[in-house]
From Swiss-Prot:
The keyword Aminoacyl-tRNA synthetase does not apply. One of its GO terms (cellular component) is membrane. It comes from Mus musculus (Mouse). InterPro entries: GPCR_Rhodpsn (IPR000276), GPCR_Rhodpsn_7TM (IPR017452), Olfact_rcpt (IPR000725). One of its GO terms (biological process) is sensory perception of smell. CDD domains: 7tmA_OR5P-like. This is Olfactory receptor 5P67. Keywords: Cell membrane, Disulfide bond, G-protein coupled receptor, Glycoprotein, Membrane, Olfaction, Receptor, Sensory transduction, Transducer, Transmembrane, Transmembrane helix. Its main location: membrane. Potential odorant receptor.
Length: 314
C-alpha cells in the first residue's frame, strides 16, 4: 500500500524509484556493468585498507587517512548501488518510507565524511611538504585520530539534518522519484509541505561543507605548489608532484561532480544528465580512488610487491 489515510491528509508509505532507464536490454547491460564496478569498488578498497593495515611502511598519517577514505567509499557505494541493481531486475521498484530515509541519511553521512577526509589529507600533505620538521609533532597519532573523528562527526551532523528534514516533509502524492535513489532534491520536489527551517539548515550546512573543504584544499595546495617550485632537488620535486597529482586527480573528479549535481542550477541541465553525473559520483569514483592513489604511489606499489613476495615464498 503506497498511501495511508490520516485524517484530512494522505500520507505516502512507499516511493517508486524510476531508475535510469525503461529499456529492458539497456537495463541488463547496465546491471552487468554496474555490478562489476561495485565488486571492483569493494575488493579494491578493501585490498587497499588491508594493505595499509599489514604493511608497517604504510603506517603513516597519509595512509591512515587514505584507509578511511577507502572505508567511506565502500559505505557510500553500498548505501545506493545494491538498491540500484535490484531496480534493474524488476519492472517497478519500490522503497519503503523508512528505507528511503535511511538511504538519504547514509548517503549524506558518507558523502560529507569524504569531503572532510579529503580536506584532512590536503592538510597532511601541506604539513609534510611545507613544514617537514614539524610534521611528527603536528600530525601525531592523537591529532590524526581527532581529525578522522571530526570528519565522521561532520558526516553525522549532515545525516542528522537530512533525516530530520525528511521526517518533517509531508508527502501527499505523487510518490514517483525520478532518480535511482532517494536524493534530497527530488524528495523536496515531491513534498507537499512548505520549505521549513530544517530544509534550510540542511542546505546551508551541505553548502558550507563543500565551500570550507574546497577552501582548505585550495589554500593547502597553493602553498604546496609554491614550496615544490622552490625545491632544488629534482628527485624531491618529482616525488612531491607525483603524490600531489594522484590526490588532485581524485579531488577534481569528486568535487567536479559534486559541483555539477548540487551547485550548478538545475535549469542548466536535464534530469537524465543529473542521473549520469550521480552514477559517476556514487558508483564510478569509489572504484577509481584506489587505482588513482595506487598507480602513481611507489610506497603502495612497493608494499604490495613485498606482501605478494611473502605469500609466494611462504
Amino acid at each position: 500500500m503506497a498511501f495511508l489515510e490520516d485524517g484530512n491528509h494522505t500520507a505516502v508509505t512507499e516511493f517508486i524509484l524510476l531508475g535510469l532507464t525503461d529499456d529492458p536490454v539497456l537495463r541488463v547491460i547496465l546491471f552487468t556493468i554496474i555490478l562489476c564496478i561495485y565488486l571492483v569498488t569493494v575488493s579494491g578498497n578493501l585490498s587497499t585498507i588491508l594493505l595499509i593495515r599489514v604493511s608497517s611502511q604504510l603506517h603513516h598519517p597519509m595512509y591512515f587517512f587514505l584507509s578511511h577514505v577507502g572505508s567511506v567509499d565502500i559505505g557510500y557505494s553500498s548505501s545506493v548501488t545494491p538498491n540500484m541493481l535490484v531496480n534493474f531486475l524488476v519492472e517497478k521498484h519500490t522503497i519503503a518510507y523508512l528505507g528511503c530515509g535511511i538511504q538519504l541519511s547514509s548517503a549524506a553521512f558518507f558523502g560529507t565524511a569524504e569531503c572532510f577526509l579529503l580536506a584532512t589529507m590536503a592538510y597532511d600533505r601541506f604539513v609534510a611538504i611545507c613544514n617537514p620538521l614539524l610534521y611528527s609533532t603536528k600530525m601525531s597519532t592523537q591529532t590524526c585520530i581527532q581529525l578522522v573523528v571530526g570528519s565522521y562527526t561532520g558526516g553525522i551532523l549532515n545525516a542528522s539534518f537530512a533525516i530530520i528534514s525528511f521526517f518533517s516533509f509531508l508527502f501527499c502524492g505523487p510518490n514517483r522519484i525520478n532518480h535511482f535513489y532517494c536524493d534530497f532534491a527530488p524528495l523536496v520536489e515531491l513534498s507537499c509541505s512548505d520549505i521549513n527551517v530544517s530544509v534550510v539548515i540542511t542546505t546551508i550546512f551541505s553548502a558550507s561543507v563543500t565551500i570550507i573543504t574546497v577552501f582548505v584544499i585550495a589554500i593547502s595546495y597553493t602553498y604546496i605548489l609554491i614550496t615544490i617550485l622552490k625545491m632544488r632537488s629534482t628527485e624531491g620535486r618529482h616525488k612531491a608532484f607525483s603524490t600531489c597529482t594522484s590526490y588532485l586527480t581524485a579531488v577534481t573528479l569528486f568535487y567536479g561532480t559534486v559541483t555539477f549535481i548540487y551547485v550548478v542550477p538545475k535549469s542548466n541541465y536535464s534530469t537524465d544528465q543529473n542521473k549520469v553525473a550521480s552514477v559517476f559520483y556514487i558508483v564510478v569514483i569509489p572504484m577509481l580512488n584506489p587505482l588513482i592513489y595506487s598507480l602513481r604511489n611507489n610506497d603502495i606499489k612497493g608494499a604490495l610487491k613485498r606482501q605478494l613476495g611473502k605469500k609466494t615464498f611462504s
